[in-house]
């Protein structure tokens, strides 16, 4: 009898605990600086900067910026400005030095697993704008895919190589990349579990006139959340019926 009462008491205590008591610890956070530039900061303090831009495209470069690692999806100046970072970070490039092939990245750096998948900057197998790289980061049970300047919908081999995605960073501005309609198709292909963050589109700050705004991509979508901060927390969670589209400001 006493054991039954004890079990009932323990169950009541567990049920009374707030929901956040059972939540998984945060994996880290993402900050968007504009264009395709994101900073991933892990809970352990690792800082990875993706596709830093050069001066002259309208966005500000923070002074004294620190990062452990910089990833470069392709060698265009709005994506490969290593000087964005103070000091001497480790640089992981997606393309070979001659830009005619992809590097092979599949390694663990501190608490982050990093790998890459070769894709194209256009829908002509690179004939117009060259090669591009998808980088996949995994930390704390969360997989983040940064599509760089993806210029096409994905084929079966590319989809298999990318694999499961929780958080998708996807270009939507067209002209140099997929536009809003093709971005929607790529999301349908990859089926991210948690979140989609659009990037590489026209904003009030951007001086790249050829870019489209995010309006075409967002048109008709119901699951959109517009944030007031350019930083968002990352935590492992169950898959949603449809990934939430999170629009970040660039500062």
Segments the model singles out, each with a brief description of its role:
Residues 8-18:
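Bacterial N-terminal signal peptides
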Residues 55-59, 75-81, 152-155, 175-181, ...:
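Active-site environment of divalent metal-dependent phosphoester hydrolases
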Residues 67-77:
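Metallo-beta-lactamase
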Residues 193-251:
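Accessory terminal helices/loops
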